[in-house]
Amino acid sequence: MSLTTPYPADLLLVARKVVWYEKPEETLADLMTFLAHLMVYGSSADVSVAEHYVPAEEFRRALQNAPAGVFDREAWEKWHERFGMPVPLLPRRRFQIGRAHV
């Protein structure tokens, strides 16, 4: 799923808050990144705004495809429990050094 432009003003405000280092339009163009940051940095009011425009299945998909380094343990567990999903280990970055993955 992707959100269509023009983006709603209330959603732009949430995007600006949770991904402060990008323009909100750029943030909303990458829905999975937006949702991951929302689930960590957003307030319950921010989440309510997003839920008005984004179905719950997209939140689940964002959890299943979460980038490494965004979620903290508390948010990771909270959102998995909210959706009745088993709580896996947090995503980790992997680096290839020669032939070995570290």
Question: Where would I find each of the regions flagged by the language model?
Answer:
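Generic structural "secondary-structure junction" signal
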Residues: 20-23, 41, 73
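Short, compact, well-ordered microdomains
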Residues: 60-97
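Extended, hydrophobic alpha-helical segments
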Residues: 10-11, 30-36, 42, 71
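Charged, compositionally biased N-terminal leader segments and the immediate start
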Residues: 1-20
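Generic structural marker for isolated residues within well-ordered, non-membrane alpha-helices
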Residues: 35, 47, 76
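Amphipathic, hydrophobic secondary-structure cores in small proteins
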Residues: 38-70
